[in-house]
Amino acid sequence: MRPRYSLILSAMRLIRPSNRRLSSIASSDSEFISYMKNKAKSINKALDNSIPLCNNFVPLWEPVLEVHKAMRYTLLPGGKRVRPMLCLVACELVGGQESTAMPAACAVEMIHAASLILDDLPCMDDDSLRRGKPTNHKVFGEKTSILASNALRSLAVKQTLASTSLGVTSERVLRAVQEMARAVGTEGLVAGQAADLAGERMSFKNEDDELRYLELMHVHKTAVLVEAAAVVGAIMGGGSDEEIERLKSYARCVGLMFQVMDDVLDETKSSEELGKTAGKDLITGKLTYPKVMGVDNAREYAKRLNREAQEHLQGFDSDKVVPLLSLADYIVKRQN
């Protein structure tokens, strides 16, 4: 076992036997995929309604219409809807209703879509394929894409504030907005992307430093918005501080696991299978989990993160927690 791999495993807590019993109640793959599709259907409908192409049947002003088209292009089709689904499930887990968290769930997905648009720009990751189709700037141009990204983040705040009309207290709504703001800025996505860009030209003194940098980068770039989805959902559902913290810890593990598997698939699958450019990180010399610890060890780390995630769900209702257990299993097994 490589020293750098043993470092990261030593940081993981031992999994108690009770966690194995909890994981055994996760639904089957087919049941969960059906569950995901049903949730995604509700989410997609809400997202579609959030960005109209007309106003009371009157076409939008042409410049605004073009921005709306760009927003919809990245937001609506494709995507697993992991983040908004997590937001809804977290709300339900602590006793809330799906409808209560739907605006916030849409907001989280809008922030995610906005970040994808920026990440794909030539000055950032310079990608031309996303979800099996040309990236936003390839279709609408860089200027309109940047405007669309800005508009999506603004709309995310507006969506969350609309939760007050659903009976959510202003205090909870404010807390949710603060959590989203944290996830977007230099405590979250911005920091992660900056670290990703800097990592391309950075040298490390030893393997441990390289691994620590990689982990910190993806805590910010990937895991932070997954955390925000769970936290905001629990806030909307009226969860206690303890419940919110446990869901946040679960979501951090899930977010890191998602990135580990994303890196693995980038090296082991084709562009056609992934719906995006495969192998690009390897070509550009970016830090990835397979590069640091190898593909097999990266897969093993993802499995350990899965068990760690399940540990944080101890004590929740055994029926309501099934979707979260199944989500973690789904991510560690995913093929695209």
Curated annotation (Swiss-Prot):
The pathway it acts in is:
Isoprenoid biosynthesis; farnesyl diphosphate biosynthesis; farnesyl diphosphate from geranyl diphosphate and isopentenyl diphosphate: step 1/1; Isoprenoid biosynthesis; geranyl diphosphate biosynthesis; geranyl diphosphate from dimethylallyl diphosphate and isopentenyl diphosphate: step 1/1; Isoprenoid biosynthesis; geranylgeranyl diphosphate biosynthesis; geranylgeranyl diphosphate from farnesyl diphosphate and isopentenyl diphosphate: step 1/1
Q: Where in the cell is it found?
A: Mitochondrion
The UniProt record lists the EC number as 2.5.1.-, 2.5.1.1, 2.5.1.29, 2.5.1.10
Q: Where are the transmembrane segments?
A: none
Q: Would you name any one GO CC term?
A: mitochondrion
Q: Which GO terms describe its biological process?
A: carotenoid biosynthetic process; farnesyl diphosphate biosynthetic process; geranyl diphosphate biosynthetic process; geranylgeranyl diphosphate biosynthetic process; isoprenoid biosynthetic process
Q: Which cofactor does it need?
A: Mg(2+)
Where do the annotations place Mg(2+) 1 binding? D119, D125
Sequence positions that bind Mg(2+) 2: D119, D125
- Cited Gene3D superfamilies: Farnesyl Diphosphate Synthase
Residues engaged in binding dimethylallyl diphosphate: R130, K221, T222, Q259, K276, K286
Q: Where does isopentenyl diphosphate bind?
A: K80, R83, H112, R131
Among Pfam families, the record links this protein to: polyprenyl_synt
Transit peptide where, by residue? 1-22
Q: How does it assemble?
A: Monomer.
Q: What does this protein do?
A: Catalyzes the trans-addition of the three molecules of IPP onto DMAPP to form geranylgeranyl pyrophosphate.
**Per its record, how is this protein called by name?**
Geranylgeranyl pyrophosphate synthase 6, mitochondrial
Q: What organism does this protein naturally occur in?
A: Arabidopsis thaliana (Mouse-ear cress)
**What is the primary gene name for this protein?**
GGPP6
